[in-house]
A protein has these predicted regions:
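Transmembrane helical cores of multi-pass ion-transport proteins
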Residues: 1-373, 378-382
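STAS-typified acidic loop motif
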Residues: 387-410
């Protein structure tokens, strides 16, 4: 009950902010994947609706994401949208299986330094993603972005009830429409759908060849989706100082991806940027996620003419705020005080994610380096004594015996 009705006002207002911020991202991710914008937008409202009821991390926002979209490019290019929908269904099945196998518990093997590196890298990527909107533009865009940041950071001193990102979007949209400013808007990103989605089945042959085509894509999408979702859940846990059910989250991601595929949407996962917006705007319960999905549906179907007028500069200001708030500034100061090995893991995670734009590669690199570092440390904490008694030698071992410490017997 507390998850639903404990933070009604904050959840509703935060959900509205998230819904507005989701629209351009969903369109952008659709373009990356090579599909029509409505595919990403259908996912952007369907997945949050499902996650609100079944998710294991209240206040976390899931939708179509860039990491998932990148994995879909080749499949869409070679085989088309229908195979993507089929792959999204199989992705959901894999995630359901992972949830029932309790693979969410594997998150305890991800060190804090890897999580910090993941957060910092994502903050950098979020900021970098805004740069195209700030290059080769008129001075109006810079002025509106600066004004938006001013509203976001100064409005809380006047009123903390209404989320400042929402005020930023409303005010800048009003100014742009009133002054008829020549700035890029949400409508310039792509056409918004003008009708509700309908139930459909992927139009693909039900045979072994189809399975062999979609299987590798589905496996990759399932792994990346769960990895990003589990990492985001951990971050929201820290921000709200509350626990989450990782295995329930795995199952819910699977259900959500299956459902969105049956209405023509693409597979998705948790979004750290939108989750941070939600939490920082006051969202704490499941109602915030539900509100985001419902409001987004209403916006794109019934209020699309108004939504299309939102200047991208307003959303850029919101995302820059997210980037600044997401980055762990304390980790820079901790480079002097933390052990070198911990800092190396964090920096390596950041470097790989930023270089490849692939969160999974970065996290796996960080986990690998952390594991090697742990194995090296453990191998040092082993003492071997031996006693020769006639023709036999007796060894007494204190510590862990494994491949890295085996040379102590020689």
């Amino acid at each position: 009950r507390k998850d639903w009705l404990g933070y009604v006002r904050g959840d509703v207002l935060a959900g509205i902010v998230v819904a507005l911020a989701l629209i351009p991202e969903a369109i952008a991710f659709s373009i990356i994947a090579g599909v029509d914008p409505q595919v990403g937008l259908y996912s952007a409202f369907c997945i949050p609706l499902v996650m609100a009821f079944f998710g294991g991390r209240p206040a976390m926002i899931s939708s179509s994401t860039g990491a998932m979209a990148l994995l879909m490019v080749t499949l869409v290019k070679d085989h088309g949208l229908q195979y993507l929908l089929a792959a999204s269904i199989l992705t959901g099945v894999f995630q359901l299986i992972a949830g029932y196998l309790k693979l969410g518990g594997l998150m305890r093997f991800v060190s804090r330094s890897v999580v910090t590196g993941f957060v910092n890298a994502l903050a950098i990527l979020i900021f970098m993603a805004q740069l195209p909107e700030l290059t080769n533009v008129t001075w109006h865009v810079y002025a509106m972005t600066a004004a938006g940041l001013g509203i976001i950071y100064l409005f809380p001193y006047i009123n903390k009830t209404i989320p400042s990102p929402l005020v930023c979007i409303v005010v800048l949209t009003g100014i742009a429409m009133w002054l008829h400013l020549d700035v890029r808007t949400v409508g310039d990103m792509g056409k918004l759908p003008d009708s509700l989605p309908v139930f459909l089945l992927p139009d693909v042959p039900l045979n072994l060849q189809t399975l062999l085509i979609i299987l590798p894509y589905s496996a990759g999408l399932a792994v990346v989706g769960l990895l990003e979702s589990m990492m985001t859940a951990t971050i929201v846990d820290d921000m709200t100082d509350t626990p989450s059910d990782k295995n329930r989250e795995c199952k819910a991601q699977g259900i959500a991806n299956i459902c969105t595929s049956f209405i023509g949407g693409m597979a998705g996962c948790a979004m750290i940027g939108q989750s941070v917006i939600n939490v920082k705007s006051g969202g704490r319960g499941r109602l915030s996620t539900l509100t985001a999905g419902v409001v987004l549906l209403c916006l794109i179907v019934f209020l699309r003419d108004w939504v299309s007028q939102i200047p991208m500069a307003a959303l850029v200001a919101v995302m820059i705020m997210v980037s600044i708030g997401t980055f762990s500034w304390r980790s820079i100061a901790n480079l002097r005080t933390h052990p070198l090995s911990t800092s190396v893991v964090m920096l390596a995670t950041v470097a790989v994610v930023v270089a490849t734009h692939n969160l999974a590669f970065g996290v796996l690199t960080g986990v690998l380096i952390a594991s090697l570092n742990f194995a090296t440390k453990v191998s040092r904490f082993m003492r071997v004594t031996s006693v020769l008694e006639g023709t036999s030698r007796t060894y007494t071992v204190t510590g862990q015996v494994f491949f890295a410490s085996a040379d102590r017997f020689t």
